[in-house]
Amino acid sequence: MQIFFPKENEFESRVSVLPETVNKLVELGIDVEVEASIGKTLHISDDLYTSFGASISKDRDSSLSSSDVICRINKPEKEEIRLIKKNSIHISFLDPFNEIELVEEFARSNISAISMELIPRITRAQKMDALSSQANLGGYAAVIEASSCLSKSFPMMMTAAGTISPCKVFIIGVGVAGLQAIATAKRLGARVEAFDTRPEVEEQVKSLGARFVQIDIGETEQTEQGYAKELSKEQIKMQQEGMKKVCAQSDVVITTAQVFGRPAPRIVTMEMIEAMKPGSVIIDMAVSNGGNVDGSISDEHVIHNGVTIVGLSNLPGKVAFDASLVYGNNLFNLLEEYWDAENKELNFDLSDEILSGCVVTHDGDIVNAMVKDRI
């Protein structure tokens, strides 16, 4: 069986596989091919990939049309899907709820498409959960980005020239990204507060040394996979009123709120921004999914009323080597789980709990229940 790892687009600093992961795949008995210069953004040479057992492809189209499995980070262009051979497997982030035409093209082309966003959040699948591995690094990168935009230091400093008070950081949304943002801001010495619509995360916030902000918005729920469910308009308004005072007292606000399969909720309004101190910084981690913050623009720094609003669509790419490392490990763990060493192929059983959750198309049909519900 041959796996092909193509280069990502010009805007992506991460790569889908590092040489060390190539070695692990080769040891399973898999033929690994990577596109020439795949590691250029990380200053990794083709020679290093070959030393770990990979073949180098200088003809992307030919490799796409001849490989049994194609692994990448970002979704392909629709035209590229038509190059991929029938009955092969394609694995990447696909954004299937917003890319229905792409999903339909995979089905028409008779390609089994696995969406890494849809890996179930169950214990057995944790090692394959790329959404969490990337969100974790994104939370770290968000705090580092905020510190570089802020004209204050994060920790308290007691000097002969006077005492510098610690930076106040407010994290909205306590999922994987939010928890890492809390931990990173605390390690940098900031005073941290956090809010989430799920009251059950309060203990996690406190365990990291942060204060959980209590805002009564009535009864809230979460999905089976642990994501917050969408709030009503009344609940969002109550939430915004409760957060306005906290934002006004904060030097940094980081929003991480996402609703699985839906546009990100608009949480920080222009009214809240205008109540904040000049020089404050807002990091909108949900900007690529519609954004949590009024006025945030993807991959731009916007200054409004003295407040810097930062919307970065690829925060894990700020720590591209580590993001590539863990993503490659996620892919390897997924492939290893279903590798049939005797027959040298993947055992594709859709009755399996993980595969039934993440396989979007198979045998010419859209087979994922959640995606089918959105068509």
Stretch-by-stretch model annotation:
Residues 7-44, 155-246:
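Glycine-rich phosphate/diphosphate-binding loop of Rossmann-like nucleotide-binding domains
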